[in-house]
Amino acid sequence: METGRIIKLISGVYQVDVDGTLYDTKPRGLFRKKKFSPIVGDIVDFEIQNTSEGYIHHVHERHNELKRPPVSNIDGLIIVMSAVEPDFSTQLLDRFLVIAHSYDLEPSILVTKKDLASENEIEQINAWLKIYEEIGYNTQFVGKHTSQQEVVATWPKGLIVLSGQSGVGKSTFINAFKPELNLETNHISKSLNRGKHTTRHVELFERESGFIADTPGFSALDFGHIDKDELKHYFIEMNRFGEECKFRNCNHIKEPKCHVKQQLENGYLAQFRYDHYIQLYNEISNRKVRY
C-alpha cells in the first residue's frame, strides 16, 4: 500500500503523486456505497496494480475543504485580483474573503497588472490595500516586471490555492513561476470585460515547497452555506470589535450599544467594509429557503 496526494481528477481517474511519481488510480466500490468521493488535495492510501495504476482504499481525514472548486488540505489561499481588465473591486474581494473564512482558510491578497494601471488607479489600490493590511491580511501588488519567484517565496509552504475571477492572471502567474507548465491563459472579453474561462478543472502542480493549484475562475460566488447570523464572524475586524458589544448576538445593524457601529463612527472601521457586510447580510436574509 502506498500513500500520496491526489493532484488531478479527469473522467473518474484520480492522478496521485508519491514523491514525484504519478499513478492513475480509481476509488474502490465502497466509496460509492458510502456516497463519498475523493477530491483533489486528498491524502490517500492506494494499492498499486500494473506499475503505474492502482485502486484507492482509504482517504485520510481532511483538515479543511473548499467546496467550489473542490480542493482539500489547503495550507494557504491566495485571492488574485487585477488592478484593471477586470477592474479591482473591493466588493468582490470582500466576498472572496468571506468565502475563505467560512471554510476556515487563511487568505492572502495578490493584485496583478500593476503595470497596466494609471497612477491614480495605483494610488487608490494602494490605499485600499493599506486598509486590508491594517485588518491583518498579507497583500502583494505586482506587475509584469515583478519577480514572481520572489513573490511565491513569501507564500506558506504546502498546498497553495490561487482563487479569483477569470482574466486576473492566475494561469499567467503560474506560467511565469514554472514556464514548463504552459497553462492556457485567459483573454478579456471586450463586451463583458470578463475573462474567458480556460482553466476548466482543478489541478495541482508541484513547487519547491509543496503544490500550487490553478482553479477554475469564478463568475459567481455561492453563500448558500452561510447563515446571516454567522456572517459577522467572517469580517474579521468586525468580529474583534463585536466582542465588546452589549449583546452577544449583536449583528451590528440596529442593535443598541453596538461597539462595531461606534468604531465605524470613530473611523476605526472602513465604511466600504461595513457597507459590503450590510449588503451581503441583506442578500443572505432575503434568499429563498432551499428544500
Curated annotation (Swiss-Prot):
Cofactor annotation: Zn(2+)
Compartments where found: Cytoplasm
Amino-acid biosynthesis keyword on record: no
Gene Ontology BP, a term: ribosomal small subunit biogenesis
Cofactor details (free text): Binds 1 zinc ion per subunit.
Protein family (similarity comment): Belongs to the TRAFAC class YlqF/YawG GTPase family. RsgA subfamily.
Protein name per its UniProtKB record: Small ribosomal subunit biogenesis GTPase RsgA
